[in-house]
């Protein structure tokens, strides 16, 4: 039970710190408009998946952002090691958060359904 709370606290702390690191330390223009939406940490605290969203829907922008984040991973992990008070800094992996796109898709479907009901 205590481990579950620790994982949750660590996830929140990693999310807060990675947002700060992206704003203040990473100078890569490819990652300037990235928002960290969530973090999943494994039960053994060895791996963390960091979910992000971007404002653009272009596939080319998504690829550029992913490349920029992959290049900055070692810097971000090093900074996390200095900022977090844990024994081992988790290995981090960035993944695009598709929930925002999915929510937009559902809203569009509901709008279409609502507009067809009026006729």
Swiss-Prot record:
Gene3D superfamilies tied to this protein: 3.30.300.20
Keywords assigned: Cytoplasm, Ribosome biogenesis
Location(s) in or outside the cell: Cytoplasm
Membrane-spanning residues: none
Example GO molecular function: ribosomal small subunit binding
Keyword Cytoplasm on entry: yes
Origin: domain of life: Bacteria
Xref: InterPro entries: KH_dom-like_a/b, RbfA, RbfA_dom_sf, Ribosome-bd_factorA_CS
Electron transport keyword on record: no
Main location: cytoplasm
SUPFAM superfamilies in the record: Ribosome-binding factor A, RbfA
Database matches in Pfam families: RBFA
GO annotation (BP), single: maturation of SSU-rRNA
GO cellular component: cytosol
Summary of the function given for this chain in its UniProt record: One of several proteins that assist in the late maturation steps of the functional core of the 30S ribosomal subunit. Associates with free 30S ribosomal subunits (but not with 30S subunits that are part of 70S ribosomes or polysomes). Required for efficient processing of 16S rRNA. May interact with the 5'-terminal helix region of 16S rRNA.
Family as reported in the entry's similarity comment: Belongs to the RbfA family.
Assembly information from the UniProt record: Monomer. Binds 30S ribosomal subunits, but not 50S ribosomal subunits or 70S ribosomes.
Protein name as catalogued: Ribosome-binding factor A
